[in-house]
């Protein structure tokens, strides 16, 4: 049976999804996966995710550990791209380049969320012009906990 709990840390929530085989902790800040506990061969739970000890560490990191990134994952050279014969200038956060969505990419956003029967869905609206990107983008991230998988 799935158990779901929420803990509040200011404007950030940690959501825990737990069943007999897995414990997933995630947050509405960057949709970070904080931890994933699974059983070893001796039936003992252990965390298999690289992460931090506190929410503040996630807020202050610059390595994207556990977070989703975007609008673009990877580096955009010279922080510019062309679309339909128009050049767009993006936020520079990696020397002259744009990396993983920029200075305030998805990894730094606080998402709205909805608890589901079997998991959690996160929602965010990236508005046109955010970090230099054109057009609105509706984002949905779902973490669904099945018997022994997410």
Model-derived segments and spans:
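Surface-exposed acidic/polar loop and edge beta-strand patches at domain peripheries
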Residues: 1-150
